[in-house]
Amino acid sequence: MALTDIRSDAASGWIPWTAAERENFFSAIARHNRAAWRVTLASAVAIAFTSAIVATLMAPLFYAAIALAFDLVNLIVPAPNLVQLLGDAIGPAIDHPEAVAPARWLQLALCAALPGLVWMALVVLALRRMLLASALFGPGPIARPCNPSALEEQRLANVVAEMAVAANLPAPRVEVTDQAILNGVIFGRDERDAKVLVSQALLARLSREELQGVAGHLVGSIANGDMAIGLRASVALSLFALVARMAAIFPNDAIGRHVWVLWHAILVPTSSRARQLALELGDPFGESNSDSTSAPAGQPRSGLNAQKSQGNWRTLLWLPLAGPIVITGFFAGLVNLFVLSPLVSLAWRQRKYMADATAVRLTRDPDALAHALEKMSGAGAPLTPWTAHLSVIQTGGNRSGPLGASVVPMFPSLDRRLRALAKLGAHVSHPPRRMPLPLVLILAALFAVVGVLIALVLYLLVILSTALTMLFTGLPFGVLHLLLRWLGH
């Protein structure tokens, strides 16, 4: 849909909307904000629920490690038998579940999930530190400061400063990239260290009014707190991607070395390690970048996802982790892909609408952003993977980072964004249409069926994980526990 074909003139036959058909930008911003926070709340509930399940599934591993630590201490000085204490605590619930009060069940569930939740909280903090240390959350070497002697670049700096004044924000630092792309993006943790990056090609193509629309969208995203919200969403999704990555590298005879490399990248987030791990977390089951490098003849590859080799006695030593890690990892990966990422993407689509409406509020010119979006359409190219969601338009072909790997696009289509701008006064030919009621009912029924199937699959995964935990974790731990207690007497 070309905007040049839908101008407001007699020849085009375009009929301006009436006042009743239009929507002021304050109402649009409030409406999209409510929708975004509703989906965000659903995403937070889903993430919390999934975190509790993942933490509970990993509980046997944590309690086994703690109990074995008590058993080792018991070899030197008397120490409590944690297995016996746990048996006394959960024995009545297993023997007579109908007699257990709901509060007691809640207490047992909290005790089961507590070690895993503490572990996940520590990992979240480490992942956030790693992502901030990674070059993927900054413009990197592709950016350079604006050249004051270049007219187009100085115009960009002036326009961004104008939009910042209109939004009552400190002026963000403005940078330019010489890459052959037609896009703009923001970087930073919050409004205090925000950066705006626009391509030189876009500066040459847009008029000053259209550049104001793009700057209004980017500054509007800063004002709406999209950088901090995007970082929190990325950290939450990368947590489940990390669990999935651990499951993906598990059946390997060098699992110990790979796990050490992975955790060292988190705990010591040097630039190269953090960047490598951040790239891998965008596709937790894919082949790591380090795998693609050729190895010498006869030598195994050394990446985090090195080629699977024949099992040996060292692999068998890791079998007690099969239940808690492998099944939990695939559980986290599936839920991340089909539940959490789509919910986050739906919320982010509303935030893009809200940034567009904020741009109209700052510029008072809905046509400016609409014309700019039309010129940018289909011209997106990757700027940086983990900040693709902070760009003006969808970066073509870029699926890196948890926010870019969803089955639901995180950006509305160009047509939908133009129709939303039309309600704010932009000159487009067709007003947005409501979805027909029969189609709404069909989609609602389809989502209900999918929800039931997902719940059933999750239940079966929990049962399967419990069985594998009892087989691979409980049995060897029980034998080792009895042996250590016998030696301690």
How would you label these PLM feature ranges?
Residues 9-11, 15-17, 125-235, 281, ...:
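Peri-catalytic and regulatory segments of divalent metal-dependent proteins
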Residues 139-157, 340-361, 406-409:
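Active-site metal-coordination segments of metallo-dependent hydrolases
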Residues 18-45, 202-237, 263, 276-313, ...:
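Membrane-interface, cytosolic juxtamembrane amphipathic helix immediately N-terminal to a transmembrane helix
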Residues 56-76, 93-117, 264, 306-333, ...:
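Hydrophobic alpha-helical transmembrane segments
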Residues 2-11, 165-195, 260-316, 338-348, ...:
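Active-site-proximal gating segments in proteases and membrane effectors
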Residues 423-489:
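Non-catalytic terminal regions of proteins
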Residues 224, 228-357, 454, 458-473:
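Hydrophobic transmembrane alpha-helical segments that form the core helix bundle
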Residues 91-138, 148, 152, 161-167, ...:
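Transmembrane alpha-helices and immediately adjacent membrane-cytoplasm interface residues
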